[in-house]
Amino acid sequence: SQIEELKGAAARRDGIVVSRIAHKWQPIFAMLKISDMLPVLSRLEEEGAHKWTDELSRNLDELLVCAEKIRTGLKLVLAKEE
């Protein structure tokens, strides 16, 4: 029916808008995640976990993912401003 088609179109449009907003804020969310993880890494180091335990390795992997998101997001922002 026409009503269902309109609802579907609205949902797709809303999904695109949410996706754009999430993409725009991705670098900030990644920075917040990094700031949340730093105390954990510091505690692990104090506890002698600097021997590359699984937990520390996982946290470092997450930091690298977040850093890549920040880099990608900032490149997009700079490209739009040029």
Model-flagged regions — what are they?
Residues 1-24, 28-31, 53-81:
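Long, amphipathic alpha-helical coiled-coil segments characteristic
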Residues 33-36:
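C-terminal helical "lid" subdomain and adjoining coupling/linker elements of P-loop NTPases
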